[in-house]
Amino acid sequence: MNQNNLSAPDWSKIPAPKEDEDLSHLLKYKIKSVLLKSTNNQSVDLSKIKGLSIIYIYPMTGQPNKPLPENWDNIPGARGCTPQSCSFRDNFSILKNLNVNNIFGLSTQTTDYQKEMTERLHLPFPVLSDKKLEFAKQ
């Protein structure tokens, strides 16, 4: 299932997600203040972001010519992080027209790793690094 062209994913080879559960109970939670380094060389505190925002969180993105971790495809939901980023890229203007103020990707990879990915995939939004797991521990 390994895909070589990570900037133009073959969606037919990405496993379909299982039905999502109702997550409405999460609306009562507030994001705590944590500064996360972004690919546009700024620190972002998600607790201070105003307006409608999308934060998509993913485990990792692959890099060309580098193998994924062993058994990566066996982890439910692990496959598809790069296509997910591409989908937000491809629908960026639509989301902006729907009054989405901010879009952020977020992973535990380093900012340098993420910068390579944002440049290669031509992402029009910043990706945030939680390398120290400060956001994840909330």
Placement of each model-derived feature along the sequence:
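Chalcogenol-based redox active-site neighborhoods
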Residues: 1-138
